[in-house]
From Swiss-Prot:
Keywords: Amino-acid biosynthesis, ATP-binding, Cytoplasm, Kinase, Nucleotide-binding, Threonine biosynthesis, Transferase. ATP binds at residues 78-88. Belongs to the GHMP kinase family. Homoserine kinase subfamily. Its main location: cytoplasm. Its EC number is 2.7.1.39. It catalyses: L-homoserine + ATP = O-phospho-L-homoserine + ADP + H(+). Coiled coil: none annotated. This is Homoserine kinase. It holds the Pfam family GHMP_kinases_C. The gene is thrB. The lineage of its organism: Bacteria, Bacillati, Bacillota, Bacilli, Lactobacillales. One of its GO terms (cellular component) is cytoplasm. GO terms for biological process: threonine biosynthetic process. PROSITE patterns: GHMP_KINASES_ATP. Pathway: Amino-acid biosynthesis; L-threonine biosynthesis; L-threonine from L-aspartate: step 4/5. It comes from Lactobacillus gasseri (strain ATCC 33323 / DSM 20243 / BCRC 14619 / CIP 102991 / JCM 1131 / KCTC 3163 / NCIMB 11718 / NCTC 13722 / AM63).
Length: 287
């Protein structure tokens, strides 16, 4: 059995901790033979191979008596780059327990469990449901709506340095003035409605008008301002900081992507670039 989980791009502009989309880059978990103890094969530096691995740890939270297996993980998703690497591991662990322990979890169950473990829903829900999702939590209940896929390329510029989520969060202010918070919320509300109506002309301006996190984090990711400037020259839809960074995501019409990449390289932006699409496919199984 193989479990596939898509990467996610969250915190889309003003959609801080609530708006994210699945993209066409995957973690693949191959469930192999039973064993005396859990062992996770992978080639990722700094990630454990035993039952403390986040995938296994998550599965055991749901089903403590699971029979140990040998697992093999292959992932296209770079670690600590704002593309949901920890969320994909959590979702893979939930699905592993769901399949091996026959838990028969609903999508709502999976979303609630994953968001509780991760701490916020904007990465895990698109990884489970696929597509673009906006979500919030009231008391102990999560509410979400699925939005139409953005029909452009997602061009991920992935700097050659990690940006720890905790460090990125520490760059944020503890409080926002009431006036600032209401203005930032109005931008998010209008953006969400524009995306739902596929009014990309309006959404284009709003997604780059974040006041929640990008103004405070852009000093940690200097590439954001540089790439956004070049993207404007190529009439891209929008450029934003993906997740907590360090990936900078640009959504752009496919016909403009090649020239945009060439301009990035010409400007000396030489790190990894991935040309992706929004993915309608959430976590899925091959047996």
């Amino acid at each position: 059995m193989k479990i596939f989980v898509p990467a996610t791009s969250a915190n889309m502009g003003p959609g801080f901790d609530c708006l994210g989309t699945a993209v066409s880059m995957f973690l693949e978990l191959d469930v192999l033979e039973t064993s005396d103890k859990w062992f996770v094969e992978h080639d990722m530096s700094g990630i454990s191979h035993d039952e403390s691995n986040l995938i296994v740890k998550t599965a055991l939270e749901l089903a403590p008596k699971l029979t140990p297996h040998r697992l093999s993980v292959k992932s296209q998703i770079p670690l600590s780059r704002g593309l949901g690497s920890s969320s994909t591991a959590i979702v893979a662990g939930i699905e592993l327990a769901n399949q091996l322990a026959n838990l028969n979890l609903s999508q709502q169950d999976k979303c609630k469990i994953a968001a509780k473990i991760e701490g916020h829903p904007d990465n895990v829900m698109p990884a489970i449901l696929g597509g673009m999702v906006v979500a919030s939590k009231i008391e102990d209940q999560y509410y979400f709506q699925e939005l139409p896929l953005i029909p452009f390329d997602f061009l991920a510029y992935i700097p050659n340095y990690e940006l720890d989520t905790k460090a990125s969060r520490n760059a944020l202010p503890e409080k926002l003035p009431f006036k600032n918070a209401t203005h930032a919320s109005s931008i998010l509300g209008t953006l969400t409605a524009s995306l739902a109506l596929q009014d990309y002309g309006t959404a284009k301006r709003l997604i780059e008008a974040d006041e929640f996190h990008e103004p405070y984090r852009q000093k940690l990711v200097p590439e954001l301002v540089k790439i956004r400037k070049i993207a404007h020259q190529h009439e891209a839809f929008a450029t934003y900081l993906s997740g907590a960074g360090s990936t900078v995501m640009t959504t752009i019409e496919h016909s403009r992507t090649e020239e945009f990449i060439a301009s990035l390289r010409k400007a000396g932006l030489d790190d990894r670039i991935e040309q992706l699409k929004a993915s309608s496919q959430g976590v899925f199984i091959e047996k």
